[in-house]
Amino acid sequence: MKMNIHCIQGSHQNEILYVNDDPFEKANMIKNCISKCDRIFFIDFGINVDDESIKQLFQPHDNTSVLVFPGVVDGIDWDLFKKKVREGSSEPVSQMGLNFDTEIAQKVQKDIYKVKKTNARTWVMMTKSVNKKSKKIYAANMFDRLMEDGNKIYAFTASKLTMTYAHECLSNILGAAGVKTN
């Protein structure tokens, strides 16, 4: 919805496509869109994108093939949390035990970093940059293969994605097994 508002305000055309969670269907969708779109904005299921990240979609990003929006990986790494607390980390407590889907390298500009490795679930692809360098989009290790082909992938580290993870309630699991709970 927020992206549509930005598109209307900036007189940008957009098309919304839905795809199943199958990695091959996702790769097929990207292949089909790469020749007819200037940019592909991909948002995986259960992710809400903040306004600052959406504004990045409309920035020029010259010499960039893909801009990823780093997100949190499911679960809390308690060993990492303990380590950071003991070291007196200046990182916010709410982030100390979290791992992210993107590993970054050197800073390029404010909030934009070069990517070492990523498995981002939200990203924007500048198709004209990618189209020149990569003939195929692969379902497995898409970002690794794009980097191998010489594509430049950067991360917008100021993104604040809200990621929803499905967890089963313990009482539902027990109830399905025939255990009565009060």
Regions found by a protein language model. Give the residues of each.
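Short, Asp-centered acidic motifs that coordinate Mg2+ and/or phosphate
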Residues: 39, 64-66, 153
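Short, solvent-exposed polar/charged micro-motifs at secondary-structure junctions
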Residues: 25-31, 78-80, 164-168
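Short beta-alpha junction loops
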Residues: 22, 72-75, 158-162
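Conserved catalytic core of nucleotide-sugar-dependent glycosyltransferases
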Residues: 50-137
